[in-house]
């Protein structure tokens, strides 16, 4: 064999896979392009993944501008466009913030981000198949054609889910590489590949490396169980694997340590949500559906389980059952184990970071099926008639059982037809001499055809209608270039620090436009931030990681340093009290306190919690609310600022009792009639409102029972339909994103708008329990009295990582800063270190003595220094180890030479 032939044999599978991938890419992209549809899914893709790419683009612009101007660009550790302020290194890590693929994709199309997003996805799909080829070629030397087909099967097994969430592809394309590096370690005793892939995994997306570590350990146990070696050898292999993981983890300490800190301080950790009936068994209907989806296109169903297989893969699984001998033992164990992981809720919960049980980890099963395909597809061309009959019977039995359970009609029986055609092809390949000589080629063509048919079924409007889950290019651009944000974007470049509240719930639009706003939708939400929202029972807390702004409540807007209120609607209804029109869609705060002001009094949080949540929010303007007493600061009892309004209830398709709300039909409603309030803001409080789980036994509990509730103020004789409605999403604990709160509050508008009733509309039939329902108004005069006692500090300058300025106090006072609390902040007053107090639930405060003071605050990512030090020490250790190793080798070589002489 000459050099050219050996090169071709070595890289044949990689090249063939890359060429074959063009076909499904063209087919799938044609569905998107023909309808001018982007690759951004209309929930997470729109609000998170696409926003993260926009954030990366802004960083690239700053880097380029910094180089052009001859100044070094320093990535800020703290960013005020992530919610009200967060650390980008930790908040965006799960969204591929440090992934080179994302940065390259954005750099190639900086002005066409939809193309960057598309390129990023297809690169990761491409890498998934290439990673499979790498692993498969090392495990088993087979024909490159079969390996390439296996790579194609593996890439598209989970394609339906990965287009929704591009960051989940990390697990898919890195998992085979991790297994390959483990095999290299076992056979060649080389730890470097595993350490390197560990480092890269932690750097780009720690979340999926965590799950891959667990899955790879399961794989290692299976390999050692089937490997003929001594106990001592197995222990040594385990030590080497752990050592490689440790070195890789320590190398990535600069990213790993801060993200671990953020994860531990994340509200969602340990939160029991999702399916909780049993740690070991899902509802029986889930297992029935799992069985059906093994032979079905459009395979996403309960608990985020995705199986988009092809008929030939299913037939290979049936053939695996028929195989005998130790050589198939490991493959059988791996396939069964990967399937069992999806069948046990506890496994889903552990792999998901001890959060809700989910099956995002179906790619190990996909890998097992693809490996079975590569190992057995050749045998499918050499079947005896008896084996053909048995396989045909197994297929027939499967189809009968699947149809008796629920059938495969949702894909137009396309999978069934293709499965039967595949069986006919197998008969032809094994019995007709004309086809026998080209069996592998024919089955490869059947594989490609199956992938194409699967894509067509999933994307077809008649069956899967997958495309409807994605945003059109025009709608995507409109979402991020909303006029209301455009009006304030230029203002955001001013040196003055302020935030913007918008009426529309375009989540993370502020982040993408580099405007400081109030919405937040990222997986990691600090505990303090969440506690703030649940203490106030905000209706805008839609999920345990999603906040749709501050509901236009004047007190909360003042505390958050909101200077402008924007809306795309020409209707002035719902504009917060105290905001004056500047131009259409833009309103300014007439009593803007600024980002820093002084309190004379403090309130203990335990005292504030004794009040209802509406009085609680007003109390934060009477005194700074803290967990403990502040030395030398007067502690007061908060006064009630809310007045309850008596009302009469009218129901529509709703049964109402003292403790229960039973909604009978869609858009059932409660109408609360009251006397017109004369001043202030109008609020609704549904105390203790909880939605009851509809049916705990059903497989449909993907997200648990949930329903939207809309509220709006009304006035008699006004027949127009206003688009100004306040919304909340009530979820049962079975929902993945359940946020426990003891009720919900809504701001309905200014009392001067003349409302005399509140209409509460329930989106769909459901059962609710509650403690009480109240309509409240606050007193504008009392509000102005409270804020007049607060002293704005105009000489405070807020940068990305620093706060500095001068403050003059007439007595012992507390400096309040509208910056989210974090242990990463440190403070100095007149050059001396001082403590920072968590204030009003989520912000920061510094106690001050009488006189003039110079204030300095600096932010450093928590645990970042320890991470940097660990990474540097690990690099030094590796270099020292390599130097010693090289010296030992040279001495050993010299010694051998002397012996020979």
Identify the function of each model-found stretch.
Residues 2-9, 53, 640-901:
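Active-site-proximal, structured, solvent-exposed surfaces of multi-pass membrane proteins
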Residues 128-136, 174-186, 214-222, 314-319, ...:
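Transmembrane alpha-helical segments
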């Amino acid at each position: 064999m000459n050099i050219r032939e050996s090169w071709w044999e070595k890289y044949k599978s990689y090249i063939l896979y890359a060429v074959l991938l063009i076909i499904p890419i063209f087919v799938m992209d044609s569905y998107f392009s023909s309808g001018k549809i982007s690759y951004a899914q209309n929930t997470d893709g729109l609000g998170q993944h696409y926003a993260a790419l926009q954030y990366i683009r802004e960083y690239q612009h700053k880097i380029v501008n910094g180089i052009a101007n001859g100044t070094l660009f320093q990535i800020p550790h703290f960013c005020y466009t992530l919610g009200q302020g967060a650390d980008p290194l930790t908040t965006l890590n799960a969204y591929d913030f440090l992934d080179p693929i994302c940065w390259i994709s954005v750099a190639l199309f900086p002005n066409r981000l939809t193309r960057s997003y598309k390129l990023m996805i297809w690169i990761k799909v491409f890498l998934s198949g290439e990673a499979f080829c790498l692993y498969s070629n090392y495990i088993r030397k087979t024909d490159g054609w079969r390996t390439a087909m296996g790579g194609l099967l593996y890439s598209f097994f989970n394609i339906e889910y990965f287009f929704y969430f591009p960051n989940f592809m990390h697990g898919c394309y890195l998992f085979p590489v991790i297994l390959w590096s483990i095999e290299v370690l076992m056979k060649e005793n080389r730890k470097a590949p595993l350490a390197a892939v560990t480092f890269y995994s932690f750097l780009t997306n720690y979340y999926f490396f965590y799950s891959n570590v667990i899955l790879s350990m399961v794989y290692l146990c299976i390999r050692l169980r089937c490997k003929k070696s001594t106990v001592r050898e197995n222990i040594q292999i385990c030590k080497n694997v752990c050592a490689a993981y440790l070195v890789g983890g320590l190398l990535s300490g600069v990213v790993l340590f801060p993200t671990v800190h953020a994860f531990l301080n994340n509200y969602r950790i340990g939160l029991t949500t999702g399916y909780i009936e049993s740690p070991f068994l899902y509802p029986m209907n889930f297992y029935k559906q799992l069985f059906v989806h093994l032979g079905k296109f459009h395979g996403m169903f309960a608990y985020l389980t995705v199986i988009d297989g092809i008929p030939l893969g299913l037939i290979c699984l049936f053939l695996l059952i028929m195989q005998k001998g130790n050589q198939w033992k490991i493959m059988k164990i791996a396939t069964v184990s990967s399937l069992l992981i999806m069948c046990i809720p506890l496994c889903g919960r552990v792999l998901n970071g001890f959060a809700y049980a989910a099956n995002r980890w179906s790619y190990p099963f996909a890998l097992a099926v693809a490996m079975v395909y590569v190992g057995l597809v050749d045998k499918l061309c050499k079947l005896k008639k008896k084996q053909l009959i048995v396989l045909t019977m197994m297929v027939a039995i499967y189809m009968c059982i699947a149809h008796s359970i629920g059938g495969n009609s949702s894909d137009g029986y396309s999978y069934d037809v293709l499965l039967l055609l595949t069986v006919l092809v197998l008969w032809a390949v094994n019995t007709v001499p004309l086809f026998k000589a080209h069996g592998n080629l024919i089955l490869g063509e059947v594989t490609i055809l199956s992938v194409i048919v699967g894509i067509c079924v999933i994307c077809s409007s008649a069956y899967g209608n997958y495309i409807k889950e994605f945003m059109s290019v025009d709608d995507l651009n409109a979402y991020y270039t909303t006029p209301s944000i455009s009006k304030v974007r230029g203002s955001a470049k001013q040196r003055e620090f302020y935030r913007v509240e918008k009426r529309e719930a375009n989540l993370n639009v502020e982040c993408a436009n580099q405007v400081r706003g109030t919405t937040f939708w990222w997986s990691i939400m600090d505990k303090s931030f969440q506690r703030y929202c649940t203490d106030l029972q905000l209706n805008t807390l839609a999920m345990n990681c999603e906040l749709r702004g501050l509901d236009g409540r004047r007190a909360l807007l003042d505390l958050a340093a909101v200077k402008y209120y924007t809306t795309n609607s020409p209707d002035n209804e719902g504009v917060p009290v105290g905001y004056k029109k500047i131009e259409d869609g833009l309103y300014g705060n007439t009593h803007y306190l600024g980002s820093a002001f002084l309190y004379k009094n403090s309130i203990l949080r335990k005292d504030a919690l004794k009040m209802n949540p509406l009085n609680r929010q007003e109390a934060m303007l009477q005194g700074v609310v803290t967990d403990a007493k502040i030395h030398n600061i007067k502690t007061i009892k908060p006064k009630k600022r809310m007045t309850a309004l008596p009302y009469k209830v009218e129901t529509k398709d709703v049964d109402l009792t003292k403790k229960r709300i039973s909604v009978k039909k869609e858009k059932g409603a409660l109408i609360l009639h009251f006397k017109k309030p004369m001043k202030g803001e109008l609020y609704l409080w549904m105390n203790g409102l909880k939605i009851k789980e509809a049916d705990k036994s059903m497989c449909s509990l993907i997200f648990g029972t949930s329903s939207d509730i809309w509220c709006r103020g009304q006035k008699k004789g006004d027949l127009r339909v206003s688009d100004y409605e306040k919304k909340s999403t009530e979820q049962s604990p079975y929902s993945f994103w359940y946020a426990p709160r003891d009720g919900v509050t809504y701001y309905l508008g200014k009392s001067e708008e003349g409302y005399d009733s509140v209409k509460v509309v329930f989106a769909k039939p459901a059962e609710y329990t509650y403690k009480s329902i109240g309509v409240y108004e606050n007193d504008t005069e009392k509000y102005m009295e409270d804020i007049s006692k607060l002293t704005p500090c105009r000489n405070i300058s807020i940068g990305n990582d620093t706060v500095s300025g001068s403050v003059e106090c007439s007595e012992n006072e507390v400096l309040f800063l509208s910056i989210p609390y974090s242990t990463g902040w440190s403070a100095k007053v007149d050059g001396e270190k001082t403590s920072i107090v968590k204030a009003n639930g989520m912000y920061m405060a510094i106690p001050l003595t009488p006189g003039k003071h110079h204030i300095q605050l600096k932010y450093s990512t928590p645990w970042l220094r320890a991470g940097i030090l660990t990474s540097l020490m690990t690099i030094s250790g590796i270099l020292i180890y390599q130097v010693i190793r090289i010296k030992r080798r040279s001495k050993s070589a010299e010694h051998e030479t002397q012996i020979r002489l």
